[in-house]
Amino acid sequence: MPSSSRRYPPGAKLRSMIVGVPREIKSHEYRVALLPVGADELRRSGNQVLVERGAGLGSGIHDEQYEKAGAIIVADRAEIWARADMIIKVKEPQPDEFPLMRENQILFTYFHFAADEELTRRVLESGATAVAYETLQDRQGRLPLLTPMSEVAGRMSIQEGAKYLERPEEGRGILLGGVPGVEPAHVVILGGGIVGTNAAKVAVGFGANVTILDNNVDRLRYLDDIMPNVTTLFSDRHTIRDQLVLADLVIGAVLIRGARAPRLVERADLKTMKSGAVIVDVAVDQGGCVETTRPTTHEDPTYIVDEVVHYCVANMPGAVGRTSTYALCNVTAPYAVRIANLGLARAAHDDPCLPSAINIHQRTVTDQAVARTFGLTFHPYVP
């Protein structure tokens, strides 16, 4: 059960922590969860930082840079998991890492539990505490630890979509921006949040015809103000169907915090789409907003259903590891330092936003959306 409420008098740090940074093992994942500057700050606060050998290479960061910052380079991944009070990662624990999770260990990473019941149950069984980047919500209702990767994924979705519209990739053979005398591609973006907005910016830059659908009229007004050359439409079942018929490239960009993405495109809709059209479902890590979505990898990123190309890579930002690592660590490192310096309970007590990131604690689901998704008992986290 969640810990009981308690008072924390002001004062120095409660105790030092051992913070572990393992190398990411998800397919073609090149990000790392901590920069050398973050390791230095943790060390200066009295914590010990263990970094797996080669963890930063995919982002152009060498072991020597971590060592200069005071981190200890460890060759054995299992040793890091065994010694660390807090594990900082980028992607959710992979099956090979399930046995390494342990009681009372803090796991600070992206989880996206709603799309993965097995992961949810394994973390529950382990007794570890899951602090999820993607559900931390600030006072304005924003998701500050998800935003940078949503920006990257939104921009990448157009890059990848443009590539797979090419004929050698089984696409329609269309240049996204067209050329003089030839019309450009029609890009339909489902969702006008961070992903959708960034996708639209890039698509407009390419010269495509862009339509964004959202069910928030205020958001549509905002998008119309900042991108007057983009068509904004209120999202409903009929409008989505009408737009799918016209689309060359569809971007799935919907999000419900902590929950599975709503299904907006059904299997039957694919038969109305153009042969060789492309769907990039950025919502795949929350289950996807297309009925035919299934997770793919950078190694084997696409598949075809009813002559429509599906690109459903669940870790798109991992392909641009250097950009993504710096963007991610800029926002996650302050929270990692705070948790390490104060302990999770004190940090959550002092920061009323932090409990929103705590999804699992002491074998209990502490996020309502995750509990509802799998029919599990929900208990709010109380620091």
Where are the language model's segments positioned?
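An N-terminal-biased, well-structured beta-alpha scaffold segment characteristic
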Residues: S5-P10, L14-R122, S126
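Rossmann-like adenosine-cofactor binding region
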Residues: D225-D306
